[in-house]
Amino acid sequence: PQGGSVHEVCDDPDFAEECDFQVVDTAGVLVGGVNDWCRAANLILVPMLPSTRDMEPTLRTLDIVRESGTGAKAYVIVNNFYAYGTLDRQLVEYLEGEGVPIIAKIPRAVALSRAAAAGVSVAEYDPKSHVVAPIELLADSVLNEEEKNNG
């Protein structure tokens, strides 16, 4: 399911300010306010699928982030990554060659959609799934970036 369909929206700005993390899940088509969101962010994660269709929108999003004047670092998360897929590897190599930092490559896993449908994390749904370790590594990377920002 789409990310925005499985999480709750916080409409209370005072409560949001007390939270350790705030997630802004934008639509697939960028809308107004993106520059403000970028400037307010500590860290920006841009998800993409390893496909030629996602390359142009991902690069366009990264350009918008750069042009926003934010001080936040921006990283790409490659979802549905297949390590043995030629196109998957070539796209990652291209991005890295262009200096685009990739914070995580999350592998394909049926457990992701099943966990979302069940309303639980993939670690709760299937703790032995091969996707749990990369997601934990992503979470650790986000926490490390937050420590750098606050440390």
Per-region residue spans from a language model:
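P-loop/Walker-type NTP enzyme "switch/lid" segment
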Residues: 1-35, 116-124
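Structural beta-sheet core signal
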Residues: 24, 46, 76-78
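Inter-motif core of Ras-like GTPase G domains
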Residues: 31-52
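Short histidine/acidic/glycine/proline-rich micro-motifs that form metal-
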Residues: 50-52, 79-84, 128
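Conserved C-terminal guanine-recognition region of P-loop GTPase G domains, centered on the G4
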Residues: 56-79
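Beta-strand-loop-alpha "switch" segments that mediate conformational coupling across diverse proteins
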Residues: 82, 92-121, 135
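Alpha-helical, hydrophobic structural elements that either
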Residues: 86-90
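NTP-binding/hydrolysis catalytic cores, primarily Walker-type P-loop NTPases
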Residues: 119-151
